[in-house]
């Protein structure tokens, strides 16, 4: 399991937190405590929780007060309270006088009879041992086993071996290999003897399938898999670096309850030949036996060197094949075959790189690979997995308690089988119980996906921690606070830059206490229940009160993730209809928001300091530039640019549908529409008399600047006895008969008038 290593902690201040693998010894050390009477507590021995009569925790159970602390502050199970400061625990029940808060941080542990693999590290064990994941799973869950065939047999009569060679073969396969190996063989091994032993040995590494098929492999075939272990003693050295790829495979077994291995001793002549030739191995103990020889100081360093040498060889082979590949460019079959070889080598190189990266991590972090296998299982503090009374004789029990109970019961059953001489390591009962124990630990840590699909509501530790509803994101990082709401954002260009639209329902919920306060202060009601009744009945004057409240407050809008300071800005709320928050489109780039379903959180600053900072620092009118580069942040988006183009474009000459029938004369020609001012144009547009792209002439009293090509005179119109008109392409000037200018008109569209009214 993982643990938190807190460094440099003084006065409850945490300077750094490190998450790493914890050994089984560390789990026992952190979970055990020595009482003043000398008793060591911490181990959970029974699956019981509470006594059904007294409703008190059972001793050595999952809620034991001796292990986790008292339920009531400074009170033991006997009912005695803390009085004497020199006596820290009760001599009768053995419970320490302490605060009940210790039941939130004190751990316990379960001592497992058979080691189990942590399900999170199953894949890494497969990478480290360079064995397929399915094979590792079959060993862990005891569905398949390993048939270990003895590499060296005593010489038969028809075989003649040298005495020196036979001594080496006997010693290599001895149970006490490290003790019995001679010094003259441990320093240097002759090349011819090594090559002879390599050809002599044959290993059978068989995973039994359901059809009981046995696949036999030569030692040379398992050469890559088996030779990845540096499992010899420290005194054993190879003569040359090239012999790193040659490692003698052996096992060392001890008949102990902690390590349920089979004692293999070729010098033991009492064993019959059939039992001696093949040995069946099952369970996680095999993996623990392999991993315990990995030491980050020596074996992993040598293994890292070996893998680097293997990577170099693969790269050289790829380089050589790549050079040959171009010579067969015009020969299709040879080209494809070489291409497949290179692809296979690249896959092998990536696999070796992944293994090298894992080994380097173990070495640099100074971790032992055997820590990935658990012999002691930590138990969470009881207040994190409580039993809650719901009333009416009903209780709610945490799912973790059921998982712990299952583990303890299966562990006790396995211990009972081991204590019974009728059962041994190879019986079906022990194999099945080992598998059940491994599955129960897996369900505690991470539940199987197949069981989740069966609508089983029990939660594992991973389900409690991970995801949106997990402990981190739900309770620690995403805490719910008062005076806050959340809704979808939509665009509203009619809002001002510093305004945001807030729905009526959200405004009532957020400003609920303030509305009640104003209702009482305006003498509309005298009691709080009366004010609540006015709000629930939605009286006619309620909107006026809400408008009055909103004028005195700013609201903070936040869009996750908040990557910079512009991710939170203050706006003046404006009451709108609907259920969505309305926002001006130009403030969206600061939030990195768009209107495709994004949500934003709304908060109300309450204190005087926070309200002052909202007006001065967070108000959107004051956040116009990026603090990093100084460039403007209120840049129009694509929809704004497209809308401005559509609003100001002149499509009358191309699209005839924009001309209303009332604007055509008897000949079908377009009438010229004249307006005296901009307001008349907007009124006509709101009355649906003109369209956005309708061409109009509007009277203009300001100075006008034109391009040179637009001042070509089109025609001169003379009105009898009144005035005459000079008409250009987009410009008209009226003069009286004495030559004084009467008025001037410019040609534009309704959309351009609307755009001009928005700018000025």
UniProtKB/Swiss-Prot annotation:
Catalytic EC class: transferase
Q: Which GO terms describe its biological process?
A: DNA-templated transcription
Q: How is the cofactor bound?
A: Binds 1 Mg(2+) ion per subunit.
Keywords attached to this entry: Chloroplast, DNA-directed RNA polymerase, Magnesium, Metal-binding, Nucleotidyltransferase, Plastid, Transcription, Transferase, Zinc
Any idea what job this protein has? DNA-dependent RNA polymerase catalyzes the transcription of DNA into RNA using the four ribonucleoside triphosphates as substrates.
* Record SUPFAM superfamilies: beta and beta-prime subunits of DNA dependent RNA-polymerase
What GO molecular functions are on record for this protein? DNA binding; DNA-directed RNA polymerase activity; magnesium ion binding; zinc ion binding
Listed under GO cellular component are: chloroplast; DNA-directed RNA polymerase complex; mitochondrion
Query: What gene is it encoded by?
Result: rpoC1
Write out the residues that bind Mg(2+): 594, 596, 598
Q: What is this protein called?
A: DNA-directed RNA polymerase subunit beta'
Which residues hold Zn(2+)? Answer: 76, 78, 90, 93
What does the record give as cofactor? Mg(2+); Zn(2+)
Where's it found, cell-wise?
Plastid, Chloroplast
Q: Which reaction does it catalyse?
A: RNA(n) + a ribonucleoside 5'-triphosphate = RNA(n+1) + diphosphate
Q: Which family, according to UniProt?
A: Belongs to the RNA polymerase beta' chain family. RpoC1 subfamily.
Binding partners and assembly: In plastids the minimal PEP RNA polymerase catalytic core is composed of four subunits: alpha, beta, beta', and beta''. When a (nuclear-encoded) sigma factor is associated with the core the holoenzyme is formed, which can initiate transcription.
Q: Which domain of life is it from?
A: Eukaryota
Q: For this protein, what is the EC number?
A: 2.7.7.6
Give the source species.
Answer: Bigelowiella natans
């Amino acid at each position: 399991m993982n643990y938190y290593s807190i460094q440099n902690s003084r006065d409850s201040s945490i300077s750094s937190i490190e998450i790493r693998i914890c050994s089984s010894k560390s789990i026992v050390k952190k979970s055990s405590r020595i009482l003043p009477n000398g008793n060591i507590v911490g181990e959970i021995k029974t699956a019981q929780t509470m006594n059904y009569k007294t409703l008190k925790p059972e001793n050595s159970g999952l809620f034991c007060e001796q292990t986790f602390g008292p339920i009531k502050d400074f009170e033991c199970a006997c009912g005695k309270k803390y009085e004497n400061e020199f006596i820290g625990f009760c001599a009768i029940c053995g419970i320490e006088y302490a605060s009940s808060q210790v039941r939130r941080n004190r751990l316990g542990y379960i001592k497992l009879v058979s080691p189990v693999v942590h399900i999170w590290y199953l894949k890494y064990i497969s990478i480290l041992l360079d064995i397929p994941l399915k094979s590792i799973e079959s060993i862990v869950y005891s569905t398949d086993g390993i048939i270990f065939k003895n590499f060296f047999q005593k010489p038969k009569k028809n075989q003649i071996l040298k005495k020196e060679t036979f001594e080496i073969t006997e010693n290599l396969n001895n149970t006490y290999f490290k003790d019995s190996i001679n010094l003259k063989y441990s320093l240097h091994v002759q090349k011819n003897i090594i090559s002879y032993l390599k050809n002599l040995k044959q290993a059978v590494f068989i995973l039994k399938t359901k059809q009981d098929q046995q696949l036999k492999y030569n030692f040379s075939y398992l050469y890559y898999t088996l030779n990845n272990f540096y499992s010899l003693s420290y005194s054993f050295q190879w003569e040359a670096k090239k012999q790193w790829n040659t490692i003698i495979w052996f096992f060392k077994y001890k008949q102990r309850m902690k390590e349920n291995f089979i004692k293999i001793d070729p010098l033991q002549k009492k064993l019959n030949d059939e039992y001696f030739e093949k040995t069946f191995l099952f369970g996680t103990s095999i993996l623990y036996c392999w991993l315990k020889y990995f030491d980050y100081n020596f074996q992993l360093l040598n293994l890292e060197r070996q893998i680097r040498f293997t990577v170099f060889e693969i790269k050289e082979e790829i380089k050589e094949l790549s050079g040959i590949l171009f010579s067969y460019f015009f020969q299709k079959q040879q080209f494809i075959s070489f291409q497949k070889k290179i692809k296979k080598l690249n896959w092998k190189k990536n696999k070796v790189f992944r293994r090298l990266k894992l080994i380097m991590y173990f070495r640099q972090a100074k971790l032992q690979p055997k820590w990935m296998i658990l012999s002691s299982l930590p138990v969470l503090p009881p207040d994190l997995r409580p039993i809650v009374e719901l009333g009416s004789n009903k209780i709610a029990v945490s799912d973790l308690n059921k998982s712990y109970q299952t583990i303890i019961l299966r562990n006790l059953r396995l211990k009972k089988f081991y204590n019974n001489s009728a059962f041994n390591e190879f019986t079906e009962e022990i194999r099945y119980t080992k598998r059940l124990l491994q599955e129960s630990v897996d369900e505690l840590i991470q539940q199987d996906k197949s069981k989740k699909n069966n609508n089983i509501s029990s939660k594992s530790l991973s389900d409690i921690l991970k995801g949106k509803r997990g402990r981190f994101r739900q309770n620690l990082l995403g805490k719910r606070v008062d005076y806050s709401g959340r809704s979808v954002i939509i665009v509203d260009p009619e809002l001002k830059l510093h305004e945001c639209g807030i729905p009526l329902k959200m405004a009532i919920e957020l400003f609920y206490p303030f509305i009640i306060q104003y209702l009482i202060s305006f003498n509309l009601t005298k009691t709080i229940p009366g004010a609540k009744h006015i709000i629930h009945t939605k009286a006619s004057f309620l909107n006026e009160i809400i408008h009055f409240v909103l004028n005195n407050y700013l609201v903070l809008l936040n869009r996750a993730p908040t990557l910079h300071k512009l991710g939170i800005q203050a706006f003046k709320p404006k009451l709108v209809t609907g259920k969505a928050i309305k926002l001006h489109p130009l403030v969206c780039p600061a939030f990195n928001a768009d209107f495709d379903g994004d949500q934003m959180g709304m908060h109300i600053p309450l204190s005087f300091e926070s309200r002052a900072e909202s007006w001065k620092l967070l108000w959107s009118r004051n956040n116009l530039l990026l603090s990093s580069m100084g460039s403007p942040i209120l840049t129009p988006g694509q929809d704004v640019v497209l809308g401005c183009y559509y609003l100001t474009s002149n499509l009358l000459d191309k699209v005839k549908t924009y001309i209303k029938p009332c604007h055509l004369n008897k000949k079908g020609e377009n009438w010229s529409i004249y307006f005296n001012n901009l307001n008349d144009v907007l009124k006509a547009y709101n009355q649906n008399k003109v369209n956005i792209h309708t061409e109009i002439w509007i009277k203009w009293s300001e100075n006008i600047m034109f391009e040179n090509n637009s001042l070509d005179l089109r025609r001169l119109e003379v009105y009898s006895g009144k005035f005459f008109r000079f008409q250009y392409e987009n410009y008209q000037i009226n003069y009286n008969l004495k030559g004084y200018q009467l008025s001037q008109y410019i040609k534009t569209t309704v959309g351009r008038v609307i755009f001009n009214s928005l700018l000025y």
